[in-house]
Amino acid sequence: HRGSFDDPRLTLHYADAFAYLESTDERFDVVIVDVPDPLEEGPAYLLFTQEFYTLLRNRLKPGGVAVAQSGPTGPAFYEQCFSAVANTAASVFPSVILSEAFVPAFASTWGFVISSLGPDPSDLSVEETDRRIAERVTGELGYFDGITLHGMTSVPKYLRTALAREDRIITKANPLYVP
């Protein structure tokens, strides 16, 4: 973690995220939502709903960003969850970016939905992204830079097509469960 957990700007909250966001007036620059799959009667299925994304949006500072784990994106499993989560986030946030990365623990690619109240970060040039990183980060990053951002947000055509066809919006009344 290269000292990131020691940064005074970081606060980790280990709690029921839905209940926490309902009960706090705190505002955040960045929220990272790393949750288990939405299993029926599981602890996290409400964290995939429009109601949760609305709470999340209302707790972000202007220009704030929320990144959420959004399910598998490989050709065999992407329709389970990913496009519905992205469509749900897009029903709440003005800017939603699709991203995927290989996750060794799952031996597969995994999707992430980046929701923003500000301009679309994927519209930034490689040079502008690198400049912003240099302003905010001491030392050199081993993985992330402007080229990496461009690559991570250039998802395969089948994912873009799935999102274009997607009409599901996940709600408390119409939850999404994965098998």
Go through the PLM ranges and name each one.
Residues 1-63, 76-82:
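The AdoMet/dcAdoMet-binding core of the Class I SAM-like
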Residues 11-13, 67, 97:
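Hydrophobic/aromatic beta-strand patches that form the interior of the parallel beta-sheet core
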Residues 31, 38, 60, 72, ...:
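Solvent-exposed soluble domains appended to multi-pass membrane proteins
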Residues 37-38, 71-75, 103-105:
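Short "lid" loop at the C-terminus of a central beta-strand within the Rossmann-like core
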Residues 53-54, 78-102, 113:
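Conserved Class I S-adenosyl-L-methionine
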Residues 63-70:
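Conserved beta-strand signature within the Rossmann-like core of class I S-adenosyl-L-methionine
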Residues 98-179:
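Soluble small-group transferase modules, centered on the S-adenosyl donor enzyme superfamily
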